[in-house]
Design a protein with these regions (language model features):
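Cap/lid segment of the alpha/beta-hydrolase catalytic domain
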Residues: 87-94, 113-138, 183, 298-299
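Short amphipathic alpha-helix adjacent to the substrate-entry channel of hydrolases
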Residues: 93-112
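Alpha/beta-hydrolase active-site loop
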Residues: 130-156, 179
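N-terminal cap/lid segment of alpha/beta-hydrolase-fold proteins
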Residues: 24-74
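Alpha/beta-hydrolase fold nucleophile elbow
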Residues: 158-169
């Protein structure tokens, strides 16, 4: 839904009870107003930040999309979806259509702004300033973490079922979802030691809310992860659905360097590399690889249909997995319509 407001429906739920009910029955004539939940725009979740040039960022905000017909007497699972932009640009409005589509499948969806910017130069020629690039990735992880903490702390206010938080994104957004899901401060001190010392905690930036959320699943449309060693079921190995083209010029098929440039170390894990690590840990994982496709790969409708199906099966306790090519239908409930 795209009408950003929160309105009272011109309807009232009237509870009428038959005579002869139990002694604990509520009296007849009790009226309980129902609110229709409408999309909310520019909900602030982080404050007092600094961008890559040292300029002050007063706040970051999110947009919240509700399923059509969602009402205030119910809670709904949430998908937090990160926009693309190569860590140099983009904003939450770029994924409004994707959020609308996921909302149509019964999820509250959240799109949020995160800090972007680094000295890009020409990544294809291996001349990107990697220090500023890794800073940009780390800031985005901080901002994603702040968004998730805010959602966990304020779920009731927004009718979010905070027991069912899913995380996803496309391109840079997929990398944010993967990396921030698998990175807490203990991990950051090992894999992002320079950025941690320079930019601070990955889980305390932007707001003072505690990190109490639990991610129940990840959707990554052509994204990467900083290491496969962090996928460990003793700690975290999230149910995941992956999409990627097998001729992606920026990401490796399994493990390798950004744009194939060794000076962009450390190596990244993508596609088959993430899939293999999750299979090894016996975590539910679906991997779609499109032959001949670069970046991006699959169309949005196919991705949203299968993401929604995968997450719903995780919720029902019937997750599925497998590796597929082309547009192979795999959703157990999908037969033309979901």
């Amino acid at each position: 839904m795209r009408n950003f407001s929160f309105v009272l429906l011109p309807l009232v739920l009237s509870l009428s009870f038959l005579q002869g009910g139990s002694s604990g029955s509520k009296p007849t004539g009790v009226n309980m107003p129902l609110f229709e939940l409408r999309d909310l725009k520019d909900v602030e979740f982080a404050w007092n930040l600094t961008d890559w040039k040292g300029n002050k960022v007063d706040s970051l905000s999110m947009d919240i999309y509700y399923p059509t017909g969602a009402t205030s007497n119910k809670k709904y699972p949430v998908v937090v979806f990160c926009h693309a932009g190569g860590f140099t640009g983009g904003n939450k409005s770029n994924v409004s259509s994707l959020c609308d589509e996921l909302a149509d499948y019964g999820f509250i969806t959240v799109a949020f702004d995160y800090r972007t910017g680094y000295i890009k130069n020409n990544p294809h020629a291996c001349t990107t300033d990697t220090a500023t690039l890794f800073n940009a990735v780390y800031r985005a992880m901080q901002d994603g973490n702040a968004c998730l903490r805010f959602i966990q702390a304020n779920g009731k206010k927004y009718n979010i079922d905070a027991d069912w938080i899913f995380y996803g994104g496309s391109s840079a957004g997929a990398s944010i979802a993967l990396n921030s899901a698998y990175c807490n401060d203990s991990i950051a001190k090992i894999y992002f030691s320079r950025e941690y010392k320079l930019l601070g905690s990955v889980e305390k930036s932007g707001n003072t809310l505690p990190r109490n959320y639990a991610i129940k699943g990840i959707a990554a449309m052509w994204g990467s992860l900083f290491s496969d060693k962090v996928i460990d079921k003793k700690f975290r190995a999230y149910p995941t659905i992956l999409f990627k083209g097998d001729e992606d010029s920026g990401l490796p098929d399994s493990v390798g360097y950004f744009f194939g440039c060794p000076n962009y170390a450390p190596p990244l894990y993508a596609g088959a590399g993430i899939y293999a690590a999750l299979v090894k840990q016996k975590a539910p994982v679906v991997y779609y690889e499109l032959p001949g496709a670069n970046h991006p790969a699959y169309d949005d409708d196919f991705c949203m249909q299968n993401i929604a199906c995968f997450f719903k099966n995780v919720m029902s306790g019937t997750p599925y997995g497998g590796r597929y090519t082309y547009y192979t239908p795999t959703c157990p409930q999908f037969d033309g319509e979901f």
